[in-house]
């Protein structure tokens, strides 16, 4: 009889993720779900809603706002969270804002450290969260490929890849001392294609930036950067052009490259994913600061 009941691979992934989310809610005193407004966050939030239906997730959402996100992302965030009736904490590094930190002036490494990493650590300390959900997947990037589902962080929020706990089957060690925490990745075993197929299957709402449209872009160092507001300086020799583009990954607009595409629907995006040979994070400028830059950022407290 058991052999007759088989889950599709998407339903298996869904069940695993829901188990992890419920496990965290049961084991930790003060968890939070990081909501970056991207496709992975959208899937993770959808799974959290399913995990506790018909009730609401017993933890708040939190968005670390660098003040450089795409306008459409912020509009979507506020509208969608309101529709779901969830608590949303928005945190920005006020010190960085007062310093006028800008990815254009100070570069991606300094901007990311101050406005993302330090801001995240500030927020986690301020609210005393002992577990934080994130939407990272192992197929995204090499340092994430070796990260546990329960990723242990010390009292300074640092990640030591050599000091992680074994995870046997679906057994997770949630023990932490005061001040320590766990970053939890329920989507660890999903791929980018899985994410898109699940979004299509479940009709999950997304920021329109993921779909191809005519957008004003500038080509800079081989990357198509969308001109999202008047803070973007146009350098000599550069020209703003309207191109049919979409985004495979979303972050701060000056540090996120668009890809030329004609995919305006979910089936077209899935077809594109089946044919692509490049990583979705190829368009993230912060990943190219230096060799192993993502691992270094994570060791400093980055998600």
UniProtKB/Swiss-Prot annotation:
The entry's keywords: ATP-binding, Nucleotide-binding, Nucleotidyltransferase, Transferase
Name the SUPFAM superfamilies on file.
Adenine nucleotide alpha hydrolases-like
Q: Output the InterPro entries linked to this UniProt entry.
A: PAPS_reduct_dom, Rossmann-like_a/b/a_fold, SO4_adenylTrfase_ssu, Sulfate_adenylyltrnsfr_sub2
Disulfide pattern: none
Gene3D superfamilies per UniProt:
HUPs
E.C. number(s) listed in UniProt: 2.7.7.4
> HAMAP family, per this entry?
Sulf_adenylyltr_sub2
Indicate the quaternary assembly. Answer: Heterodimer composed of CysD, the smaller subunit, and CysN.
- Spell out the protein name for this chain: Sulfate adenylyltransferase subunit 2
Organism from which the protein derives = Saccharophagus degradans (strain 2-40 / ATCC 43961 / DSM 17024)
- Which gene is the coding source of this polypeptide chain? cysD
């Amino acid at each position: 009889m058991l052999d007759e009941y088989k889950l599709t691979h998407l339903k298996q992934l869904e069940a695993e993720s829901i188990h992890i989310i419920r496990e965290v809610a049961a084991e930790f005193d003060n968890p939070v779900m990081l909501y970056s407004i991207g496709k992975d966050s959208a899937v993770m939030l959808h799974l959290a809603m399913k995990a506790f239906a018909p009730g609401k997730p017993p933890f708040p959402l939190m968005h670390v706002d660098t003040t450089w996100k795409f306008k459409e992302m912020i509009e979507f965030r506020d509208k969608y969270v309101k529709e779901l009736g969830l608590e949303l904490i928005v945190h920005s590094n006020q010190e960085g804002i007062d310093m006028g930190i800008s990815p254009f002036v100070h570069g991606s490494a300094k901007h990311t450290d101050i406005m993302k990493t330090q801001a995240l650590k500030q927020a986690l300390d301020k609210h005393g969260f002992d577990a934080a959900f994130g939407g990272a997947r192992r197929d995204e990037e090499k340092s994430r490929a070796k990260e546990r589902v329960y990723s242990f962080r010390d009292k300074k929020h640092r990640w030591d890849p050599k000091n992680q706990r074994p995870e046997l089957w679906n057994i997770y060690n949630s023990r932490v001392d005061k001040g320590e925490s766990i970053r939890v990745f329920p989507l660890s075993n999903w791929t980018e294609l899985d994410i898109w197929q699940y979004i299509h299957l479940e009709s999950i709402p997304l920021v329109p930036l993921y779909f191809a449209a005519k957008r004003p872009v500038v080509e800079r160092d081989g990357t198509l950067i969308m001109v999202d507001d008047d803070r973007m300086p146009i350098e000599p020799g550069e020209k703003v052009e309207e191109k049919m583009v979409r985004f495979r990954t979303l972050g701060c607009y000056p540090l996120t490259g668009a890809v030329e595409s004609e995919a305006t629907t979910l089936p077209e995006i899935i077809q594109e994913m089946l044919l692509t040979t490049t990583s979705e994070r190829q368009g993230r400028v912060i990943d190219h600061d230096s060799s192993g830059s993502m691992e270094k950022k994570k060791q400093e407290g980055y998600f």
